[in-house]
Amino acid sequence: MEQTRKIPNQPLPTPTSQSKKRRTPLLSFLSKVSWKLRLQKRELLKNALFVLAERARDPNAKKRHLAMRGLGALAREAPDKQVRKYKKVMLDLLVRGLYDPVSSEVIHESVKTLTIMLGKIQGHGLGSFFIDITLQARTLLDDEDDSVRYSAFVLFGQLASFAGWRWKKFFTQQVNQTQDSLLGHLQDESPKVAKACKMTVRACVPYLKPRKVPSFQSEEEQKNHRLSRQLSHCHPEILLFFYANKIL
């Protein structure tokens, strides 16, 4: 039976001007819907932040932990512009969680979320929060939990990048008081922590204080100075060892 016939190949019909006119109102409608959704998202973010702020102050540690996780999700998913807009509120809640008197889970979640926050705001506008975060991050470098130590080293490395001129003197003191921890964890039993520590040491090299040298340097002292500069670029962990043991 020859009922099936081959249909010759024909070019697809091009859209007429009439179909284009129909499409224009559709695009306009979609853009309006998109704009309304963006407004709703902004309002949703504000409302979500209000709820999380209440949960972060709850007497129940589990609820506080969930609040920190929620802040982490907001910091990760919200547009950078919105995160910067509400950074003071978020930082206040996260620092509160960072110093939680009871729950190590709340503290760890706060550290993880702070690493996201600092990445989003690039360290701008931290204000006095910088001191609070640095002091607690230092204590967590020696935590028993591998995951907490890892997150603390990542956070401390970020702080080294964002210290700037305002906090340079303060952070230099903190780094030099942390030399033993930095040196010890280069050989951490957790490879992940050891790697994070190495990256943090590299970020902290500009804040390491060598011993003071007199204005007149002997040939040996000049060689030591050159060696310090070379090690700071190539092997900062060795330089840290030399400084900690007063070899250089």
Swiss-Prot record:
State if Plastid is listed as a keyword: no
InterPro entries for the chain: ARM-like (IPR011989), ARM-type_fold (IPR016024), HEAT_Maestro (IPR055406), Maestro_heat-like_prot (IPR045206)
Is the keyword Plastid in the record? no
Q: What is this protein called?
A: Protein maestro
User: From the record, what ranges are coiled-coil?
Assistant: none
Q: What is its main location?
A: nucleus
Tissue spec: Prominent expression seen in testis, brain, liver and heart. Weakly expressed in the kidney.
Keywords attached to this entry: Nucleus
An example Gene Ontology cellular component term from the record?
Answer: nucleolus
One Pfam family recorded for the sequence: HEAT_MROH2B_C
Q: Which Gene3D superfamilies match?
A: Leucine-rich Repeat Variant
Residue ranges of the HEAT repeats are: 128-163
Localization, per the record, is: Nucleus, Nucleolus
Region annotation (Disordered) ranges: 1-23
Report the superkingdom from the record: Eukaryota
